[in-house]
Amino acid sequence: MTKVNSQKYSKALLEVAQEKGQLEAILTEVSEMIQLFKENNLGAFLANEVYSFSAKSELIDTLLQTSSEVMSNFLNTIRSNGRLADLGEILEETKNAADDMFKIADVEVVSSIALSEAQIEKFKAMAKSKFDLNEVTVINTVNEKILGGFIVNSRGKIIDASLKTQLAKIAAEIL
């Protein structure tokens, strides 16, 4: 499925949830389903043509047992439109669209050593202002190859203040 189609389905779900005043509840359901899909590799199951439509439909019936009315209608629409193979992607796109709506993001900070809590808080504040976000979760990744400094990545926007990059720039200027 194309990203455009995933966006259409996710936008429709978010609009209906908003109209019914159930946006927060639906987003909770979406997060739970994403987790369920990851833990049980359900996306691969639904995308695999080896399994019959009825087997995949049984999975949706199981999900419907614990779903709200809005989510149930959404899942039934996905099933009737033959988009079960794309359900995982649609759920991820729904989460991304909601994160954009509420200005929420995970921010990866790559550093040569683990960051302290105080440093993480500073990166949260910096990311909120630089990327215009309301809520930030900092994910610290240690990579000794950057030598020092840091690289901040939030949804494709990158701030590279690593020593390795600065040295490479100096070397390029000299040569």
Swiss-Prot record:
Subunit structure: F-type ATPases have 2 components, F(1) - the catalytic core - and F(0) - the membrane proton channel. F(1) has five subunits: alpha(3), beta(3), gamma(1), delta(1), epsilon(1). F(0) has three main subunits: a(1), b(2) and c(10-14). The alpha and beta chains form an alternating ring which encloses part of the gamma chain. F(1) is attached to F(0) by a central stalk formed by the gamma and epsilon chains, while a peripheral stalk is formed by the delta and b chains.
SUPFAM superfamilies recorded: N-terminal domain of the delta subunit of the F1F0-ATP synthase
Full protein name: ATP synthase subunit delta
Membership in a protein family: Belongs to the ATPase delta chain family.
HAMAP family named among the record's database cross-references: ATP_synth_delta_bact
Any GO CC annotation of this UniProt entry: proton-transporting ATP synthase complex
Membrane topology listed for this record: Peripheral membrane protein
PANTHER family: ATP SYNTHASE DELTA CHAIN
Molecular function, one GO term: proton-transporting ATP synthase activity, rotational mechanism
Function text: F(1)F(0) ATP synthase produces ATP from ADP in the presence of a proton or sodium gradient. F-type ATPases consist of two structural domains, F(1) containing the extramembraneous catalytic core and F(0) containing the membrane proton channel, linked together by a central stalk and a peripheral stalk. During catalysis, ATP synthesis in the catalytic domain of F(1) is coupled via a rotary mechanism of the central stalk subunits to proton translocation. This protein is part of the stalk that links CF(0) to CF(1). It either transmits conformational changes from CF(0) to CF(1) or is implicated in proton conduction.
Organism, scientific name: Lactococcus lactis subsp. cremoris (strain MG1363)
Coiled-coil region(s): none
Keywords noted in UniProt: ATP synthesis, Cell membrane, CF(1), Hydrogen ion transport, Ion transport, Membrane, Transport
Localization of this protein: Cell membrane
Gene name, Swiss-Prot/TrEMBL: atpH
InterPro entries: ATP_synth_OSCP/delta_N_sf, ATPase_OSCP/dsu
